[in-house]
């Protein structure tokens, strides 16, 4: 019976011991104020009373969670580049038309990061983020009169008034302002199209005129096409015409996927649209045919729309179809929700698309837009979303810093523990070796090694190399700290008792000494984490760390070396700099708070 009672009491005793360590000794209600705190409770109490340290924890946890969790909801293609979205300022007003237009709209056209529209009175409106200030210089109403058509391009706008006179403003380089002589005095213009660095104008007679960057698109008219054109579409390097007899004619001599037109549709085409990847044609019966490159999903036509399409429009990588039941369907790339069409109850009279935006104009003149609304933190010089890169860069920077700290802490604990416990020649030898490692300058060493290896190693191998070098060269500091703590702890009575019981040296270090100095190690590792993050960022900043296209907070700051970036594109360096600064300061505040919390003297201050 006694043996059974002992077995029952043993787990109960262990549970009580654990409870007392965390919760403290239970005290009577009358003695609550004088209740004793366990060491763990004292550390937690001291830390929670340090408002700066608590604020540091909150800031770091928020940044950490954002960098770890948000990329799952905001994925990023690290190879994505789009010069049409380069250096876009922060904001979400790209698809918000002015109140004076919404409810009285006649036509809307989508540019790269801005839009232009006209109301039923012929007034011109602009909104969005403008690539250059010249776009805001709209010719006066007295000069233009009543405008009947508008078209937005990469960074310029075309307009034509009721007298057939053309107007252009925005970028005036590469001959964009040189309107052909035949059109300057006014003409019977059927369609205008502002494109990527060039402009097009189609007359009612079926003649097409082009001007602008002639090196980008070399237009060549097949026999019998000029003078017989009913509609024209264009992307960044090709112009395609729809003739009055229902034929699709690419205006080029070069053969490509765009020129592989299905023969069965020739002579029966009623409308066309073109993305940067493919061409879509709608026949007189409402059937849709698509051909071109296989990327971005533009060839995947929804089966349910066949036979019901009444109009087509196209953005940079998506198509939009208006159906006979007044609904809209979009397919293709949906990176910026440009394929998520809204439900519109009113009768839709026209649809328009361009780049990453789409609009539907209703019978009452209301404008419904969907697609790219803007960027929270703007874009960089290659059109990449700064916010998404900031999240991915934070994940990379924190990962490099954390693994480097784990490596340095592991080596430092082993070397410092053995050195402090053994003493004598072993201590002397290990500490001299630590001094040799400390004398190696990290940044010059990493730069030289990176220059020597160059492109011989992959980007993944380079990242691993940086983590290993950071960890291997930064352990001496924690090794000295562990050595000093072990030297003090090895003289304690519990260590002598463990030796007397025959506990092995490794067991004494691991089970008896290390638990007593673990708080010191945690504090030092926390401070080293911030240092490693700054070191990695410094290396990436000067081009010897993690390189493009992989983002880190360091290489995102590289552009700040340019005076134009500092002055005009502030968002490219302000947001990464603030995030890195807040993160490292927060970690240092946490480290200082932990150091003060484990210091018994902090209770007296």
Task: Kindly label every feature range from the protein language model.
Residues 382-605:
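Alpha-helical transmembrane segments of integral membrane proteins
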């Amino acid at each position: 019976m006694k043996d059974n009672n002992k077995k029952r009491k043993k787990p109960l005793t262990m549970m009580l011991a654990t409870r007392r360590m965390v919760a403290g000794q239970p005290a009577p209600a009358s003695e609550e104020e004088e209740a004793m705190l366990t060491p763990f409770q004292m550390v937690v109490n001291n830390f929670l009373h340090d408002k700066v340290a608590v604020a540091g924890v909150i800031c770091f946890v928020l940044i950490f969670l954002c960098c770890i969790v948000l990329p799952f909801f905001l994925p990023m293609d690290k190879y994505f580049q789009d010069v049409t979205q380069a250096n876009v300022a922060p904001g979400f007003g790209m698809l918000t038309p002015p109140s004076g237009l919404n409810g009285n709209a006649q036509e809307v056209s989508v540019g790269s990061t801005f839009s232009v529209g006209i109301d039923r009175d012929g007034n011109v409106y602009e909104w969005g983020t403008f690539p250059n200030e010249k776009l805001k210089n709209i010719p006066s109403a007295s000069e233009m009169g009543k405008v009947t058509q508008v078209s937005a391009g990469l960074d310029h706008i075309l307009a034509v008034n009721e007298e057939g006179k053309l107007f252009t403003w925005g970028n005036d380089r590469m001959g964009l302002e040189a309107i052909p002589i035949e059109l300057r005095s006014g003409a019977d213009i059927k369609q205008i199209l502002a494109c990527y660095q060039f402009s097009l104008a189609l007359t009612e007679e079926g003649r097409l005129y082009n001007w602008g960057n002639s090196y980008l698109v070399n237009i060549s008219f097949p026999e019998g096409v000029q003078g017989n054109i009913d509609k024209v579409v264009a992307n960044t390097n090709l112009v395609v015409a729809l003739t009055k007899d229902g034929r699709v004619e690419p205006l080029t001599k070069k053969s490509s996927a765009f020129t592989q037109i299905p023969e069965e549709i020739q002579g029966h085409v009623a409308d066309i649209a073109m993305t940067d990847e493919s061409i879509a044609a709608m026949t007189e019966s409402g059937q849709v045919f698509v051909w071109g490159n296989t990327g971005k999903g533009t060839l995947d036509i929804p089966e349910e729309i066949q036979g019901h399409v009444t109009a087509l429009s196209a953005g940079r990588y998506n198509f939009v179809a208006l159906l006979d039941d007044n609904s809209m369907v979009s397919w293709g790339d949906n990176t910026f929700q440009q394929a998520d069409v809204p439900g519109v109850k009113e009768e839709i009279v026209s649809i328009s698309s361009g780049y990453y935006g789409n609009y539907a104009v209703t019978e009452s003149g209301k404008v419904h837009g969907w697609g790219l609304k803007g960027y929270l933190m703007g874009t960089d010089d290659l059109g990449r979303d700064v916010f998404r890169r900031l999240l991915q860069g934070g994940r990379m920077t924190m990962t490099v810093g954390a693994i480097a700290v784990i490596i340095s802490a592991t080596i430092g604990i082993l070397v410092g523990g053995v050195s402090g416990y053994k003493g004598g020649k072993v201590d002397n030898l290990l500490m001299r070796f630590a001094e040799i490692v400390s004398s190696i300058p990290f940044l010059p060493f990493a730069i030289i090694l990176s220059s020597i290896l160059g492109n011989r190693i992959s980007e993944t191998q380079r990242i691993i190399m940086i983590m290993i070098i950071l960890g291997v060269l930064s352990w001496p500091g924690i090794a000295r700290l562990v050595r000093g703590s072990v030297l003090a702890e090895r003289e304690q009575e519990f260590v002598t008792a463990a030796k007397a019981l025959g506990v092995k040296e490794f067991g004494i270090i691991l089970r008896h000494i290390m638990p007593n100095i673990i708080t010191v190690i945690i504090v030092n590792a926390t401070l080293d984490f911030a240092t490693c993050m700054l070191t990695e960022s410094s290396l990436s900043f000067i081009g010897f760390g993690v390189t493009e296209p992989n983002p880190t907070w360091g290489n995102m700051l590289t552009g700040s070396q340019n005076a134009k970036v500092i002055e005009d594109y502030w968002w490219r360096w302000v947001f990464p700099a603030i995030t890195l600064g807040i993160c490292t300061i927060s970690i240092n505040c946490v480290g200082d708070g932990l150091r003060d919390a484990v210091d018994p003297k902090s209770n007296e201050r």
